[in-house]
Amino acid sequence: MAGLDQVIDYIKNLNFSYEDVDYLRGLGLFSEDFLHYLSGFHFSGDIYAIPEGSVIFPREPLLKVVAPIMEAQLVETAILTILNHQCLIATKASRVVYAAQGDGIMEFGLRRAQGPDAGLYGARAAVIGGCVGTSNVLAGEMFDVPIMGTHAHSWIMTFKDEYTAFKEYARLYPDACTCLLYTSDAAD
């Protein structure tokens, strides 16, 4: 299970600003009573969930919302989006960590994530799934996740060959040196 912390933060801080309500009013789809309700919205329900980091199984309830139907409907999509994304990442990370048979696995998903927030919360979810750290510096700062990484592929392009680039990187970072093969020249 991953994402519960973000779900709780979302629900605690959910509100509709004057600008939000004014935009909705401009759509001409909603009654003034509903818009007035939104302008004073505060979630009053209860959330029950299994703890983050727990193993989850198919058809197992992860989270239960007990609230008036209107409130539950207003938070449903966000809850599903958050939990679906982070549980997916944590599950995949757990499988990779298991396959590594005790070797540490680092998370480097930011460049492939579907947006900065997905990269940020994906890094957190990967660590919940067992990764030992992340290349995402903001995730390290926000979630106290160990930071680790490698050089950029462009690092190698600034040298005459891979060997020279690796040697210089190892000189600069003797205690934290992990080198990447330059993918366009991997056969060399």
Annotate the PLM regions:
Residues 47:
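Structured beta-strand/loop patches that form or line metal/cofactor-binding pockets in enzymes
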Residues 188:
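Short, glycine/acidic-enriched loop or turn micro-motifs at the edges of active sites
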Residues 1-25, 29:
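Intrinsically disordered, low-complexity, positively charged segments
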Residues 29, 35-44, 53-58, 62-184:
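Buried, small/hydrophobic-residue-enriched core segments of structured protein domains
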